[in-house]
Amino acid sequence: MLNIGQFSFHSRLLLGTGKFPDFDVQQKAIDVSEAEILTFAVRRMDIFDAKQPNLLEKLDVKKYTLLPNTAGAKNAEEAVRIAKLAKASGLCDMIKVEVIGDDRTLLPDPVETLKASEMLLEEGFIVLPYTSDDVVLARKLQELGVHAIMPGASPIGSGLGIVNPLNLSFIIEQATVPVIVDAGIGSPADAAFAMELGADGVLLNTAVSGANDPIKMAYAMKLGIEAGRLGFEAGRIARKRCATASSPLEGMSVVE
């Protein structure tokens, strides 16, 4: 089970809802992924205008936990305002903190992310900050009392996969809260690798919505995450420089 705050989930796949070709494809992809947590950008959805079509109208919201994010925020104050807007609309108190510090790389601003997380914790939110793979920053966020850490595998939407597995492994090893790898996942193999490293979950969007067949890719991601988790729990063999015979040599007869 994936435990975040007082919530528990069977699925370790968190799915973003942006950039799908249409609502029908989006819904089918969500269904086959079996994701229980769906994230969306509050600023890109007019949640107070009933005349505007949006994701919330199309979903059976009782089946999912909605994770609004603060995408578009440039500083902590903007992130807090967006989070409060989401809460006022009756959505879950869980919030993904996203404060971008660089428009080219879309990497998070570490100072403002820390500040926003602290402010939102004081407001009673369940806080999940999107961060880089900075090991020290992840620890400082954890010390604040956030409910999960969401380090990026690589820049948002890049599809580069996990470019720094060593740092991710350090973050996972020191974690006392769930670690959900977020951003940069491009394939089911990337998602499986994140889980093999010991991540508690994976959040992805573009890898599914931008695929040639988003529905098939959503299912593939589900399987990749499940396989990676099983592999982590099973425990891989140690890496060795030299070969080891897989068949026992004792008792074998020698042909003259």
Swiss-Prot record:
CDD domains listed in its UniProt record: ThiG
Keyword line: Cytoplasm, Schiff base, Thiamine biosynthesis, Transferase
Gene Ontology cellular-component annotations: cytoplasm
Keyword Transferase: yes
Protein function: Catalyzes the rearrangement of 1-deoxy-D-xylulose 5-phosphate (DXP) to produce the thiazole phosphate moiety of thiamine. Sulfur is provided by the thiocarboxylate moiety of the carrier protein ThiS. In vitro, sulfur can be provided by H(2)S.
Pfam annotation, one family: ThiG
Domain of life: Bacteria
Residues reported to bind 1-deoxy-D-xylulose 5-phosphate: G157, A183, G184, N205, T206
Localization: Cytoplasm
Catalytic activity: [ThiS sulfur-carrier protein]-C-terminal-Gly-aminoethanethioate + 2-iminoacetate + 1-deoxy-D-xylulose 5-phosphate = [ThiS sulfur-carrier protein]-C-terminal Gly-Gly + 2-[(2R,5Z)-2-carboxy-4-methylthiazol-5(2H)-ylidene]ethyl phosphate + 2 H2O + H(+)
Any one GO molecular function term: thiazole synthase activity
Protein name: Thiazole synthase
Matches recorded under SUPFAM superfamilies: ThiG-like
Enzyme nomenclature, EC number: 2.8.1.10
